[in-house]
C-alpha cells in the first residue's frame, strides 16, 4: 500500500460541501492535508454582513472535524487585477466574458498554487469535477468528471501542463449525490449546505445593478435586422447573444407570435439587434475565430485537427475542425451552431479528454461576419 503521509496536499476550501469532501477523502487516504480558504472578493453587503466570514467559519468547522490545520489567504488584489479587470474590459467591449475560466487559470492554479508551495505543498487539490491521469511519459491528461451534469473541465480548459502536474481532483470519479452522501455520513458541518451558483463576486445581487456600479450604461436603439426600430435598449453590456426576453418588447409582433431574442450587437453604432424565433437566421453560424488558444499539453505551433467542442457550459459536444496558428484558431462546425457568443470559451475534447481551448472572438456564417459586435 502506498504511504501518502509524506505527500503534502494543500486543499482550496471554500466552505462548500465539495471542497469539504475533497479534504476529507485526502485525509482518509493518508495524505498530509492542509486546508486554505481564499478570500478573493470583499462581499460585505449593505448590512455589514460578509458571506466570506460565514464561509470561513464553515471551513474552520470542517477542518476541526477532520483534524487538519487551516489558513486563510487574501487574494483580493490579485483577483481584481487578473480577473475582475478582464471581466470589465470584456463587457466594455460588448462581449460576454466567463470569469470562472480566468479565475481558475490566474487565481486557483496560479496565485493559490504559488502560496501552497510556500506551505511545502507537493500538490494542490480543489473540489472540481474533473479527473487527471498521468501517462507512462509522465504527461498529465485532464479527463471529464464522471458526473456528466457536474463536469467542470470547461472551466479548467486554460490550465497548463505545469499546473495540471500539481493538481488533484479527488471528486472526479464521483457523482454529486455520492459527494453529499459522504459528507452526511461523516457528519460534516457543510453536508446540507446549498451549492453556490452564479459569478462569485456578484452572488445574490442583481447583475444589472452590480455592473452599473462599475460601467456607465449607454442607452441606444434596438432594431430588427431589416431596419425596424423597436425602441430603446438600456446598454449593450446588459444583453448577450441568444438571450430571450429582457428587452421590453414582448407585446410587439413582427408577423408571428414567436418570442424575441437578441441576435446581434453593433458596438460602434450602439445598436442592439433583435429577431423573432429561437433559430433566427442571424443567430446561426458555421465557424468562429478564437484567440488565447491554449492546450493542456505541448502541441505544434501550427496544425489542424478534428475533435469535438463546447461553446458554453453543459452544452452537448459538437463536431468541429480546428485550424491552429500560434495562439489563434479557426473552428469550423460540422453543423451550424446557435448563439456563438464572443467572450465565451470554446473548449476542445478528444473523447473524454479535455485538450484545451480559447476565447471566442468572432462568429461567421458561410464566411461572412455575424453582426455580433
Curated annotation (Swiss-Prot):
Q: Which residues bind ATP?
A: 12-19, 38, 127
Which SUPFAM superfamilies does this entry report, sorted A to Z? Adenine nucleotide alpha hydrolases-like (SSF52402)
MF terms from GO for this chain are: ATP binding; tRNA binding; tRNA-uridine 2-sulfurtransferase activity
Catalytically driven reaction(s): S-sulfanyl-L-cysteinyl-[protein] + uridine(34) in tRNA + AH2 + ATP = 2-thiouridine(34) in tRNA + L-cysteinyl-[protein] + A + AMP + diphosphate + H(+)
Q: Which biological process annotations from GO are given for this protein?
A: tRNA wobble position uridine thiolation
Q: What is its EC number?
A: 2.8.1.13
Choose one Gene Ontology CC annotation of this protein and give it. Answer: cytoplasm
Q: Site (Interaction with tRNA): which residue positions?
A: 128, 344
Question: What task does this protein carry out?
Answer: Catalyzes the 2-thiolation of uridine at the wobble position (U34) of tRNA, leading to the formation of s(2)U34.
Q: What is this protein called?
A: tRNA-specific 2-thiouridylase MnmA
Q: Which organism is it from?
A: Streptococcus thermophilus (strain ATCC BAA-491 / LMD-9)
Amino acid at each position: 500500500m502506498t504511504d501518502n503521509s509524506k505527500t503534502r496536499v494543500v486543499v482550496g476550501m471554500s466552505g462548500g460541501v465539495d471542497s469539504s469532501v475533497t479534504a476529507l477523502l485526502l485525509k482518509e487516504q493518508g495524505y498530509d492535508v492542509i486546508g486554505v480558504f481564499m478570500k478573493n472578493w470583499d462581499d460585505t453587503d449593505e448590512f455589514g454582513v460578509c458571506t466570506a466570514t460565514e464561509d470561513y467559519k464553515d471551513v474552520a468547522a470542517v477542518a476541526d472535524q477532520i483534524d487538519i490545520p487551516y489558513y486563510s489567504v487574501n487574494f483580493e488584489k490579485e483577483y481584481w487585477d487578473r480577473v475582475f479587470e478582464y471581466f470589465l474590459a470584456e463587457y466594455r467591449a460588448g462581449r460576454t466574458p466567463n470569469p470562472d475560466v480566468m479565475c481558475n487559470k490566474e487565481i486557483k492554479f496560479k496565485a493559490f498554487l504559488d502560496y501552497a508551495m510556500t506551505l511545502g505543498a507537493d500538490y494542490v487539490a480543489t473540489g472540481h469535477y474533473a479527473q487527471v491521469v498521468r501517462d507512462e511519459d509522465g504527461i498529465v491528461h485532464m479527463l471529464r468528471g464522471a458526473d456528466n451534469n457536474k463536469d467542470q473541465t470547461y472551466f479548467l480548459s486554460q490550465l497548463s501542463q505545469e499546473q495540471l502536474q500539481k493538481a488533484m481532483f479527488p471528486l472526479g470519479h464521483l457523482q454529486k449525490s455520492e459527494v453529499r452522501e459522504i459528507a452526511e455520513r461523516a457528519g460534516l458541518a457543510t453536508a446540507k449546505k446549498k451549492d453556490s451558483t452564479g459569478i462569485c463576486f456578484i452572488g445574490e445581487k442583481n447583475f444589472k445593478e452590480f455592473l452599473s456600479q462599475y460601467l456607465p450604461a449607454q442607452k441606444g436603439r434596438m432594431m430588427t435586422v431589416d431596419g425596424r426600430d423597436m425602441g430603446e435598449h438600456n446598454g449593450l453590456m446588459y444583453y448577450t447573444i441568444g438571450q430571450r426576453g429582457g428587452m421590453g418588447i414582448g407585446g410587439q409582433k413582427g408577423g408571428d407570435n414567436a418570442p424575441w431574442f437578441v441576435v446581434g450587437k453593433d458596438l460602434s453604432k450602439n445598436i442592439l439587434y433583435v429577431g423573432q424565433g429561437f433559430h433566427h437566421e442571424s443567430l446561426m453560424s458555421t465557424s468562429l475565430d478564437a484567440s488565447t488558444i491554449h492546450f493542456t499539453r505541448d502541441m505544434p505551433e501550427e496544425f489542424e485537427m478534428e475533435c469535438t467542442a463546447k461553446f458554453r457550459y453543459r452544452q452537448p459536444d459538437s463536431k468541429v475542425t480546428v485550424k491552429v496558428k500560434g495562439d489563434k484558431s479557426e473552428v469550423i462546425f460540422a453543423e451550424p451552431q446557435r448563439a456563438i457568443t464572443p467572450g465565451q470559451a470554446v473548449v476542445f475534447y478528444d473523447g473524454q479528454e479535455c485538450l484545451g481551448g480559447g476565447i471566442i472572438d468572432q462568429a461567421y456564417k458561410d464566411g461572412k461576419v455575424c453582426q455580433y459586435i
